[in-house]
Amino acid sequence: MFESLSDRLTAALQGLRGKGRLTDADIDATTREIRLALLEADVSLPVVRAFIHRIKERARGAEVSSALNPAQQVVKIVNEELISILGGETRELAFAKTPPTVVMLAGLQGSGKTTLAGKLAARLRGQGHTPLLVACDLQRPAAVNQLQVVGERAGVPVFAPHPGASPESGPGDPVAVAAAGLAEARAKHFDVVIVDTAGRLGIDEELMAQAAAIRDAINPDEVLFVLDAMIGQDAVTTAAAFGEGVGFTGVALTKLDGDARGGAALSVREVTGVPILFASTGEKLEDFDVFHPDRMASRILGMGDVLSLIEQAEQVFDAQQAEEAAAKIGAGELTLEDFLEQMLAVRKMGPIGNLLGMLPGAAQMKDALAEVDDKQLDRVQAIIRGMTPQERADPKIINASRRLRIANGSGVTVSEVNQLVERFFEARKMMSSMLGGMGIPGIGRKSATRKSKGAKGKSGKKSKKGTRGPTPPKVKSPFGVPGMPGLAGLPGGLPDLSQMPKGLDELPPGLADFDLSKLKFPGKK
């Protein structure tokens, strides 16, 4: 997502660092690079001009000249202006005071309306709503069938009285279907109605007339314009045409996971004045989220998206299990069973590469992230599942014959089993040292108190009271996901992330005082 734009902007701002004072020439050179980066990303020219003008004005003002770190202040200005053109504040879906809330989807053919309808329905269902999908795309062959398949995957009913375009059936009336779907929702007490309409390969009067007729028939609370982020400069033209012909209250961006330059996201909000509500980043139903302008700007500038990562963790981790795992890690008692549970929870959050990409500075290690293969985690999972409960609880009992049995049972080599067991012990020791060194209450003290009484130094004599014992060797922090020890060293295929950029083991600015104990994890069911 925005990889090329992120690389160009990061490189442009990197040249300012280390300078105690910025000259007009420095500002001009930096804004020139930013301008080229935005234009290459297919951002609309008027948007680029206004964006660069605002940055220059602020960069030459008092807020930069009087700052202790002028370069960092310019980065802050660019971040704030990016947030501004992306919409400023997060805008949620507006629900009607009296159900049902009617959401109409409009857009060009192939923009992803039908799939997005299922994603939105699945999200609303997860929030406790009872959505109904209405199939009003009666012109594209198999469009109704596609919506029924998507609705079944999302666990949401589909209202489709007409089979859609086919040689056997005549043309249907999408306006009548939309009105009947709304009546069906009221009769059966659905609180949200999502209407999937037909698209075209281009803007034409027939498309506009049909969409406007459906809008007038159902009087929707929200009209979402579904925009393909890969269409480049045409995004502005298409959005403006739909705005004049039909009118819409929000934008949903699709295909943000593609390799396109993605300038549509930076243009459509500024040109139309309509907020971006949702962003779709994949084909799965869960690859869909509310669009946060501040987080998107942070990711574009290579500063990561820690808050989204935390929110995803809150959805999959159980509070009690997380506390128990943290206590076991601190005491050096983490088992392979605990490790397996944590790994399965992390995998529910999405591909590991995507999760690591949300960390600050991840853009500097793209090559390493590109090597991350989730299939290697399947092999690790198979190895652990091939062990007996006793072996998972106490890996020390896994001798040579047991390792051979585990390898044969899980379809891997003995060396892979050896690597997993050995690196599990190393990671458990490292994580115990890390948590103990952080001074977290109740963590890391159990194992420490065991050795506090009668502790002996290298000479075999007891340490004198009040004197320091031998300094323990420094242990390098493993780079991995919380609760997943030794991710960097799992067998075969996973990259060595030990050479991570400076600062990745720290929270980014603004989150330094973040209290992890206040995270709201779902309770144990």
Swiss-Prot record:
InterPro entries: AAA+_ATPase, P-loop_NTPase, Signal_recog_part_SRP54_M_sf, Signal_recog_particl_SRP54_hlx, Signal_recog_particle_SRP54_M, SRP, SRP54, SRP54_GTPase_dom. This is Signal recognition particle protein. Belongs to the GTP-binding SRP family. SRP54 subfamily. The SRP-FtsY complex formation results in mutual stimulation of their GTP hydrolysis activity. Keywords: Cytoplasm, GTP-binding, Hydrolase, Nucleotide-binding, Ribonucleoprotein, RNA-binding, Signal recognition particle. PROSITE patterns: SRP54. Transmembrane segments: none annotated. Residues 437-525 are annotated as: Disordered. It catalyses: GTP + H2O = GDP + phosphate + H(+). It is found in: Cytoplasm. The gene is ffh. GTP binds at residues 107-114, 196-200, 254-257. The lineage of its organism: Bacteria, Bacillati, Actinomycetota, Actinomycetes, Mycobacteriales. Disruption phenotype: Depletion of ffh (SRP) and ftsY results in differential expression of 14 proteins. Part of the signal recognition particle protein translocation system, which is composed of SRP and FtsY. SRP is a ribonucleoprotein composed of Ffh and a 4.5S RNA molecule. Can interact with FtsY in the absence of 4.5S RNA. Gene3D superfamilies: P-loop containing nucleotide triphosphate hydrolases (3.40.50.300), Signal recognition particle SRP54, nucleotide-binding domain (1.20.120.140), Signal recognition particle, SRP54 subunit, M-domain (1.10.260.30). Disulfide bonds: none annotated. GO terms for molecular function: 7S RNA binding; ATP hydrolysis activity; GTP binding; GTPase activity. One of its GO terms (cellular component) is signal recognition particle. Residues 480-497 have a biased composition (Low complexity). Pfam families: SRP54 (PF00448), SRP54_N (PF02881), SRP_SPB (PF02978). It comes from the Bacteria. Composed of three domains: the N-terminal N domain, which is responsible for interactions with the ribosome, the central G domain, which binds GTP, and the C-terminal M domain, which binds the RNA and the signal sequence of the RNC. Its EC number is 3.6.5.4. One of its GO terms (biological process) is SRP-dependent cotranslational protein targeting to membrane. It is an enzyme of class 3 (hydrolase). Involved in targeting and insertion of nascent membrane proteins into the cytoplasmic membrane. Binds to the hydrophobic signal sequence of the ribosome-nascent chain (RNC) as it emerges from the ribosomes. The SRP-RNC complex is then targeted to the cytoplasmic membrane where it interacts with the SRP receptor FtsY. Most of the substrate proteins are involved in stress regulation, lipid metabolism, intermediary metabolism, and cell wall processes. Shows GTPase activity. Residues 447-467 have a biased composition (Basic residues).
